[in-house]
Amino acid sequence: MSRSVKKGPYVDPKLLKKIVEMNKKNEKKVIKTWSRSSTIVPEMVGHTIAVHDGRKHVPVYITEAMVGHKLGEFAPTRTFHGHADTEKTSKVK
């Protein structure tokens, strides 16, 4: 179920404050955040946000196509290394 339109998108207030201040100063620095549930808003376009994946911060460059998605969608938390190989044994008949 999606969030109510009446409430608006959730964006971490501290993260949004940093973005707005950087837009006023016209500077682009990497911003570290643990807020994976924050929605990407148009003010974030062009910035690089380092999103925590549980182990490290993954840098995510925000583009216009990402607006409306969550930050956590672009920082995968699980690493898949493939299934275990079965040993190729020769069967003697």
Swiss-Prot record:
Residue ranges spanning the membrane: these are none
- An example molecular function term from Gene Ontology annotations: rRNA binding
- Which GO cellular component terms, listed alphabetically, does the Swiss-Prot or TrEMBL entry include? cytoplasm; small ribosomal subunit
| Assigned keywords, A-Z | Ribonucleoprotein, Ribosomal protein, RNA-binding, rRNA-binding
The highest taxon in the source lineage is Bacteria
Single GO biological process annotation from the record: ribosomal small subunit assembly
- Name the protein family: Belongs to the universal ribosomal protein uS19 family.
Q: Briefly, what is this protein's role?
A: Protein S19 forms a complex with S13 that binds strongly to the 16S ribosomal RNA.
What name has this protein been given in UniProt?
Small ribosomal subunit protein uS19
